[in-house]
Every structure is written in C-alpha cells, then in structure tokens.
Design a protein with these regions (language model features):
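A generic fold-level signal
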Residues: 20, 90-92, 105, 166, ...
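N-terminal glycine-rich phosphate-binding loop and ensuing alpha1 helix
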Residues: 1-66, 97
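Structural beta-sheet core signal
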Residues: 3-5, 51, 125, 150-153, ...
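Catalytic-core segments of class I nucleotidyltransferases/pyrophosphorylases
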Residues: 121-124, 131-132, 136-144, 155-159, ...
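Conserved beta-loop-beta/alpha segment of the NTase-like Rossmann-fold superfamily
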Residues: 62-168
C-alpha cells in the first residue's frame, strides 16, 4: 500500500520557518515534520511513499538524497576513493518525489501523481503539516468495510488558547487548551480508491471542495471518527507546542518504538 503526502504548500502562516524551506521540512525534535508523518505510517506497515513537492521541493529531494549518509556510520577512505558503511539506521522506505508545481492546488497535486497510485486497490493520502496518533491500520480496515471510494478522518480540532476558570473578575485557575466547539472537521488521513482521480479536473482543483463534496453527495465518502490526538502545524505557536510535546518525551503521535 502507498501513502501520498501533500508537501507543496507555501506555509505563509508560519513564514518565520518557511522562508528557506517548505513547510513539511520544518523540524520537530531535529527531524522534519514530514519524517514524523512517515514514521506514523511506517509503524503500521506502510513504507511506500509518494511525496507531492512544490514550493522549494528541492529541499525535500536533497534531504532524501542524503538520508542514507545521514542515517549510517560511514568511513570515507579519501586516498583510495572508497566508502565503507558500518551500520545502517535508515528506515525501509521507498520514497518517490514528484514535482507537482508551485501553484497547484491540492486536488491538482493528487491528479499529477495519479500514475503512481492508479494500480493500487486503495491508497492513503494526507497533508505534510500535521501529526496524529490515528490508528492507520484500523482506518484502512474501516475504509474497506464501508465499500466507498473515499474515507476521511474526522476529528475535533484543538483549541488555540488556554482557558481561564473565573469567578467574577477573579481568575481561579488556568485550564489546558480546550477542544473546539465539539464539531468534527476533516482531519486528513484519507484512504482512497484510485477512482477518485476521476473527480479531479486540473491543477486548479481543490480536493477539499468539489471532489469531496461530490463524493459526499453520491454517498461515497465515509468518516473514520478519531477522538485521540490530532494537531496541525499552521502557526509558529503550533510548532512550539509540538516541540514542547516532543521534548517532554510524551509526544502522543510517536506510535513507533
């Protein structure tokens, strides 16, 4: 099974981090958030990835081009022009990197990688800027049982700010960031049939609009309800929050050992 990751956006709301690199390459705990997402899928046995590159996509390509060197113990024999690998720590991943254009919309990016997923029974799709502890194995099983063309992960978004417990004009205590108003949203982490490619017109197609709306109208869109951890990295505040969780040693999305 393959996972397609949308990694071509500009990341304008986190421009402090994205002036020199694409948003999926912003680091959490010294690793790109893209790496964290891939580790989540890999923990569930999915090791084949198609990355939809766009803005500064060469940074992603260079990262994986040098990944083997970064993740191995190596001796370089300069005199004899030899390289000896002592220990390899790299993951068992197959990574296909596709330039899908700087200005292409999400649906257009998926359409541009259609040849890489057209022969799959089903494939996963997600965004390259958010992490979760969603159980991918259960998600895929759910999708197959629903017998639909598309399944999204429905989740309750986290609140943006901490809440105050007050008594009149006095603050009694602080509470952790509450979740939103209780309404579930599209949290990404899709499982799709290759048939969804037929719903994508061109580079201007926004996956979250007409394609998903049509699938819903036709009864071909299911929702896998996830009540666990889910966090996008939309702002610098989000990035700092994820970094704090990682440094605490209790990052909820770290489902791998």
């Amino acid at each position: 099974m393959k996972t397609v990751i949308l990694a071509g956006g500009l990341g304008t709301r986190i421009s402090e981090e994205t002036s020199t690199r694409p948003k999926p390459m912003v680091e959490i705990g010294g690793k790109p958030i893209l790496w964290h997402i891939m580790k989540t899928y890999s923990a569930h046995g999915i090791h084949d990835f198609v990355i939809c590159c766009g803005y500064k996509g060469y940074v992603i390509k260079e990262y994986f081009a040098n990944y083997f060197l970064h993740m191995s113990d190596i001796t370089f024999d300069m005199q004899n022009n030899k390289m000896e690998v002592h220990q390899r720590y790299a993951e068992p991943w197959k990574v296909t990197l596709v330039d899908t254009g700087d200005d292409t919309m999400t649906g257009g990016r998926l359409k541009r990688v259609a040849d890489h997923v057209k022969d799959e029974e089903a494939f996963c799709l997600t965004y390259g800027d958010g992490v979760s502890d969603v159980n991918i194995t259960d998600l895929v099983t759910f999708h197959k049982a629903q017998k639909v063309k598309a399944t999204l992960t429905a989740t309750i978004p986290p609140g943006r700010f901490g809440a105050l417990d007050m008594n009149g004009n006095k603050v009694n205590s602080f509470r952790e960031k509450p979740k939103g108003d209780g309404a579930m949203i599209n949290g990404g982490f899709f499982v799709l049939s290759p048939q969804v490619i037929e719903y994508l017109a061109d580079d201007k197609t926004v996956w979250e609009r007409e394609p998903l709306e049509r699938l819903a109208e036709e009864g071909d869109l299911a929702a896998f309800q996830h009540n666990g951890f889910w966090q996008p990295m939309d702002t610098l505040r989000d990035k700092m929050h994820l970094e704090e969780l990682w440094q605490s040693g209790k990052a909820p999305w770290k489902v791998w050992s």
